[in-house]
Amino acid sequence: MSGRSGKKKMSKLSRSARAGVIFPVGRLMRYLKKGTFKYRISVGAPVYMAAVIEYLAAEILELAGNAARDNKKARIAPRHILLAVANDEELNQLLKGVTIASGGVLPRIHPELLAKKRGTKGKSETILSPPPEKRGRKATSGKKGGKKSKAAKPRTSKKSKPKDSDKEGTSNSTSEDGPGDGFTILSSKSLVLGQKLSLTQSDISHIGSMRVEGIVHPTTAEIDLKEDIGKALEKAGGKEFLETVKELRKSQGPLEVAEAAVSQSSGLAAKFVIHCHIPQWGSDKCEEQLEETIKNCLSAAEDKKLKSVAFPPFPSGRNCFPKQTAAQVTLKAISAHFDDSSASSLKNVYFLLFDSESIGIYVQEMAKLDAK
């Protein structure tokens, strides 16, 4: 071509291509002008809007793919998208009023029905059978004529269970009656040797009233009470618990990483508090150290002949452990500990969870444990 042919034609780039996004910027601009015609729409508004929508779509697709993989499905279904949104706290708040077509609903199964479905006879008996037995005994005692004396005894025994930590009735109540009021058991799994792992939901302020024999307190080397779990325990236990921790600091000294120390739980419903020095995320062999920490907590509970112990989520305060990694390491360590030990005094292990994201992660990881 000669030079007289004029300028070479350039292919016109779309607004989306110039902005580096996939979603149509021009269409979003038209929608914004159509819906908000009274206001001035800047040129960057639809670009930013397209970028945000694209990021959210990619995030949901990634989480839905993880849900499909965990459920051993090759394709992503609307159900997986619903689970992905429900398991992410921020997405759940953002899309709270959104209905996903053909996504179904989130299961809220009562613990009694869940126990029947899985066939754990021991759990269904402990939950269902005691109330009718007690009522039946009261009715038969009334026929014999001893109404007042026999009706008064069960009331006093119920009140004394949380306080008298040295009696055997407390250990039976923690294992049979569950962790108490304000705690919801979402699901459970029985291991080979009979230990039960239970996902328990509650508010962090109720941790002091949890009826277990041992509560794990993730802390630092100085056994301080500055994190959320420590503050909740101090608030529930009061000055008595604070003095007990001070005595433990003097006698035990600073804890090594993964070391566990046991103290009396003065002012709490539990018998003992197991303080453990958890590692910092990003340090050398932090996952191995966290696994060792959990095993040391279980060994400390077994040394005290405890029958039940409660683990709060280990991404606690300054250690910055990712929730998914911490849940995987926790379940792996507990399963390995009970596989290696031929006999253990522990019968119930509770995972005390406070937010929906942690619950979703533990449900997925428990399902993987079932598959193994």
From Swiss-Prot:
Transmembrane segments: none annotated. Gene3D superfamilies: Histone, subunit A, Leucine Aminopeptidase, subunit E, domain 1. Residues 115-182 are annotated as: Disordered. GO terms for biological process: brain development; establishment of protein localization to chromatin; heterochromatin formation; negative regulation of gene expression, epigenetic; negative regulation of transcription by RNA polymerase II; negative regulation of transcription of nucleolar large rRNA by RNA polymerase I; nucleosome assembly; positive regulation of keratinocyte differentiation. GO terms for cellular component: Barr body; chromatin; chromosome, telomeric region; extracellular exosome; nucleoplasm; nucleosome; nucleus. It comes from the Eukaryota. SMART domains: A1pp, H2A. The modification N6-lactoyllysine is found at K7, K9. It is found in: Nucleus; Chromosome. There is a cross-link at K239 (Glycyl lysine isopeptide (Lys-Gly) (interchain with G-Cter in SUMO2)). Residues 135-161 have a biased composition (Basic residues). Residues 184-370 form the Macro domain. Residues 2-117 form the Histone H2A domain. Keywords: Chromatin regulator, Chromosome, DNA-binding, Isopeptide bond, Nucleosome core, Nucleus, Ubl conjugation. It holds the Pfam family Macro. GO terms for molecular function: chromatin DNA binding; protein heterodimerization activity; RNA polymerase II transcription regulatory region sequence-specific DNA binding; structural constituent of chromatin; transcription cis-regulatory region binding. Belongs to the histone H2A family. The nucleosome is a histone octamer containing two molecules each of H2A, H2B, H3 and H4 assembled in one H3-H4 heterotetramer and two H2A-H2B heterodimers. Variant histone H2A which replaces conventional H2A in a subset of nucleosomes where it represses transcription. Nucleosomes wrap and compact DNA into chromatin, limiting DNA accessibility to the cellular machineries which require DNA as a template. Histones thereby play a central role in transcription regulation, DNA repair, DNA replication and chromosomal stability. DNA accessibility is regulated via a complex set of post-translational modifications of histones, also called histone code, and nucleosome remodeling. May be involved in stable X chromosome inactivation. This is Core histone macro-H2A.2. It comes from Homo sapiens (Human).
